[in-house]
Amino acid sequence: MINEILDKVVRLLEEVRAKKPLVHSITNYITATDCANVILAVGGSPTMADYVKEVEEIASISSAVVLNMGVISDGMVESMILAGKSANKNNVPVIFDPVGAGVANFRNESAEKILSEVKIDIIRGNISEIKFICGLSSETKGVDASESDMNMGNDKKAIVAQELAKKLNCVVAITGVDDIISDGKRNVILSNGHKMLANVTGTGCMSSALCGAFAGASNDYFIAAICAILTMGISGEIAYEKSKGIGMGTFHTSLIDAISMMNENIIKEKAKVTTINR
């Protein structure tokens, strides 16, 4: 099964470069540039429009829509819901990144409102955010997962991912030291990445943007999420090796470089994928 998954990941890497999907990303001003750059790096075409009077139209002609709650406001929530509904109407996949869910009441209410009005195809977050969305008690550290949540075993995280995937009828990606991806039936653990990724603002947001790029070129959103998270994790490892002893700026640049150079040989040499039978 793992070889089959990796074959599909490799094909999708090629397809996204051939199709150049338009990815409509409503994200935050902290990470917008990096999100746009990683979409470009894998072969997609980003648009970052968030004005309420144009998001419906742009979402309707896009290949994927990414909704990111990094910086939230009444106007941003309205734009996200309008874009999401337009995407649903036009069979465009929607990726949701509930940044900081569980931190504050307005953010929590916003996440719940988006989920109640928009059909989500992929939801990506850390374990604390996903536990909150799943209706479980969770602790957060700003927009980061709490230490107690991060210390949950992979088996328990997989149960959370699978249950939420069934509940929302979508793909769930929990990212962390190990990444858990589930569509409610298929479940995998991805063990790539490097701790330096946590020291760069927005690598989670970039992962969600990559989910949009790959979902925009595929009907299998489980494989799209795997492709996105593997690309980020492996690129983090490569970037660390290239920037070791130099500094964070070089790591950041090397990360984008590695994403842009991802290919079949790198995937098949470095991917660490484990299936979970549940």
Swiss-Prot record:
Catalytic activity: 5-(2-hydroxyethyl)-4-methylthiazole + ATP = 4-methyl-5-(2-phosphooxyethyl)-thiazole + ADP + H(+)
Cofactor(s) the record lists: Mg(2+)
Entry GO MF terms: ATP binding; hydroxyethylthiazole kinase activity; magnesium ion binding
Pathway note: Cofactor biosynthesis; thiamine diphosphate biosynthesis; 4-methyl-5-(2-phosphoethyl)-thiazole from 5-(2-hydroxyethyl)-4-methylthiazole: step 1/1
Protein's UniProt keywords contain Signal: no
Binding site for substrate: M48, G202
One GO BP: thiamine diphosphate biosynthetic process
InterPro entries in the record: Hyethyz_kinase, Ribokinase-like
Family: Belongs to the Thz kinase family.
Biological function: Catalyzes the phosphorylation of the hydroxyl group of 4-methyl-5-beta-hydroxyethylthiazole (THZ).
Protein name: Hydroxyethylthiazole kinase
